[in-house]
Amino acid sequence: LRDRPVLIDAAAIEERHMSAAADPSVTQRPDVFAFFDAATNTISYVVEDPGSDACAVIDPVMDLDYAAGRISFAGADAIVAHVRGRRRTLQWIVETHVHADHLSAAPYIKATLGGRIAIGDRIAVVQEVFGRIFAEGPSFRRDGSQFDRLFADGDIYAIGGLRAVALHTPGHTPACMTHLIGDAAFVGDTLFMPDGGSARADFPGGDARTLFRSMRRILDLPPSTRLFMCHDYGPGGRPIRWESSVAEERRDNIHVRDGVAENDFVTMREARDRTLGMPRLILPSLQVNMRAGELPPPDADGRRFLKLPIDAL
């Protein structure tokens, strides 16, 4: 599971694309398609290699009717239709972290299109914390083995001929990763649009100072790097947006633009977090997402349940 080889179908990719994937000096521009889930303000992505049929899916959403206890896959089906319609081969299903505000559709996407489910290798830390909170027994593995691949900081992998790099950017959670794919960085919940600022840092294992340093790591990328958000809430009623750039964020981000001191950010972020309630779907989301998007195992009658721990968060 913890192997690090880059899996590439060499027969399917032209030599020039392989050379580009191996050479960090070559600027690559993937095609990026966004899918907005209005119920959770989440943006999922299909990332395509223009030089082959390969693609990846990032942060797919499973629909949950919380009051009725019903799941469905309308949003995931839109992604499936896109991939099939463009005759793409899915190589990766990437989770930027264990999300606390929506349930992952990664297993559904994998069963429908193939691909490998991947997350950062600090997932074991998150599983240990929430395994205790949800009183999971020994059958719940706390080693990340529910996922097909665990990325360490700096791991390089390929999407067809695209070079992708996994960057550990903790602070929102201990396991958050940013994925730099060509000239595009998928930042998860670490960074928001300039008028949205930054993610909260008060979940178990979160830390505002660590978050600041992770954001500055992202903002040390080349100024033209495209940044793709996992969430947007349309501050002030503006239309939903999900793409900015390093240059825009360094100039305009209300929390972490150039000139903001680390200590000032920490003071602001911690004070703001004390005013925030928990996300509406945090309890079901964590139980599912720490299992790589699988529901908890069924009981003797084949029924599946989600727990509601009292005063645990």
Predicted features and spans:
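Metallo-beta-lactamase
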Residues: D53, P60-Y66, F134, D143-Q146, ...
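Generic preference for hydrophobic
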Residues: V32, I93, I117, A166, ...
